[in-house]
């Protein structure tokens, strides 16, 4: 909805939520590490995506981290829990292009893949 407000009613593309979540996770990992390196991301990205206080934005996560807490980022595309191989099983939506717009055909929540 926020995207549509800022972009003359245009809806975001089918992967916008995933892209948004990736940026949020990386930013939270860097915030938690206090460093801006690939190693910092690698060492912190899992810990900001599970086991802490649920947050859905960088701003909320930054506050929790600043207070010494742990965060569990719950993304726009669903939960961001990594498996042992580093994959996130997110929610899936089957979409179709109709009359110049994306429409949802079927939605599968992340919990369906656990």
What are these model-predicted stretches?
Residues 1-114:
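Extracytosolic ligand-binding ectodomains
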């Amino acid at each position: 909805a926020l995207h549509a407000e800022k972009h003359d009613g245009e809806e975001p593309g089918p992967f916008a939520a995933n892209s948004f979540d990736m940026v949020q996770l990386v930013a939270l990992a860097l915030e938690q590490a206090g460093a801006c390196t690939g190693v910092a991301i690698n060492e912190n990205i899992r810990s900001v995506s599970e086991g802490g206080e649920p947050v859905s934005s960088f701003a909320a996560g930054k506050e929790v981290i600043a207070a010494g807490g742990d965060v569990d980022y719950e993304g726009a595309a669903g939960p961001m829990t990594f498996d042992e191989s580093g994959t996130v099983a997110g929610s899936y939506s089957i979409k179709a292009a109709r009359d110049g717009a994306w429409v949802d055909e079927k939605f599968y929540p992340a919990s369906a893949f656990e």
